[in-house]
């Protein structure tokens, strides 16, 4: 009898130890470098980094969930347990993040004005864009410029993607474009773009954090805290930053 009990323990123990907590990682950033074709991009790679981390000990199975921003807002409001990737505190209301906990910044990003080197544009406030054609992305709101765009002092032409804007700039159809520095760095590395002029003054700067939302559990919260504290010195994270051209904007905190 004792021998049978021992055998059962040896059989069942690995199954019990192998039970994993599923943790959703949400993203509403669908542009490079965060999402690429064929399940590639920084978001997928970050999930793999968590799942393969030795400190995880197979306790947690992180899964990427791609959501439009409105559905993210619903999950936050309902206190749904999960982790929001690459989020910026100023882009959310206090009520939306009342049940969440912010990590330290992972990336220090900004909205850059990019132009051709033979016709460089330097941003000095909305008035400096008067009479120019600005390339924007559909659905993006540039608060500081909205009044001048509405009055048609600034001509804004929208496209679906940042890459389309770059192509329009290179063909001379717009004077300047707005693009996140993270996306610009990726395309510079991936497409080996020639010299482009980047305004010394961006439209604005913003930090990208993780937002741990809802009752996700003390164990996973404690694990993520330790993982993120060590992230700046994690060689696998450094490889990802190099791969996507993001070393210049990586936070050292």
Where are these regions (language model features)?
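Periplasmic-binding protein-like
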Residues: 28-31, 108-112, 189-225, 248-253
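A ligand-binding cleft/hinge motif common to bilobed small-molecule-binding domains
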Residues: 85-97, 175-204
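Extracytoplasmic small-molecule ligand-binding "clamshell" domains
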Residues: 20-97, 136, 158
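Ligand-binding clefts/hinges and TM-proximal coupling segments of bilobed small-molecule sensing domains
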Residues: 58-61, 140-151, 195, 228-253
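Acidic, polar ligand-binding/catalytic clefts
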Residues: 64-128, 142, 200-203
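Bilobed "Venus flytrap"/periplasmic-binding protein-like clamshell domains
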Residues: 30-33, 37-49, 116-151, 182
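Extended ligand-binding regions for polar small-molecule ligands
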Residues: 44-54, 117-120, 132-133, 210-248
């Amino acid at each position: 009898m004792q021998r049978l009990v021992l055998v059962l323990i040896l059989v069942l123990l690995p199954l019990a130890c192998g039970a994993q907590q599923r943790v959703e990682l949400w993203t509403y950033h669908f542009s490079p470098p965060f999402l690429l074709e064929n399940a590639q991009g920084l978001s997928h790679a970050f999930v793999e980094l968590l799942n393969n981390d030795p400190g995880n000990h197979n306790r947690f199975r992180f899964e990427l969930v791609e959501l439009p921003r409105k559905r993210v807002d619903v999950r936050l409001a309902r206190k749904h347990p999960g982790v929001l990737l690459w989020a910026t505190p100023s882009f959310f209301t206090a009520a939306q993040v009342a049940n969440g906990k912010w990590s330290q910044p992972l990336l220090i990003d900004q909205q850059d004005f990019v132009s051709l080197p033979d016709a460089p544009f330097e941003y000095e406030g909305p008035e400096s864009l008067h009479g120019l054609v600005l390339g924007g992305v559909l659905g993006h709101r540039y608060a500081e410029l909205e009044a001048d765009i509405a009055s048609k002092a600034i001509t804004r032409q929208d496209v679906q993607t940042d890459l389309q804007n770059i192509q329009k700039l290179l063909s001379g159809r717009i004077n300047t474009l707005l693009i996140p520095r993270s996306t610009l760095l990726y395309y510079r590395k991936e497409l080996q773009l020639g010299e482009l002029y980047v305004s010394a003054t961006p439209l604005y700067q913003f930090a990208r954090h993780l937002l741990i939302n809802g009752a996700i559990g003390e164990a996973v919260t404690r694990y993520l805290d330790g993982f993120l504290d060590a992230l700046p010195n994690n060689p696998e994270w450094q490889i990802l930053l190099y791969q996507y051209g993001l070393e210049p904007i990586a936070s050292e905190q």
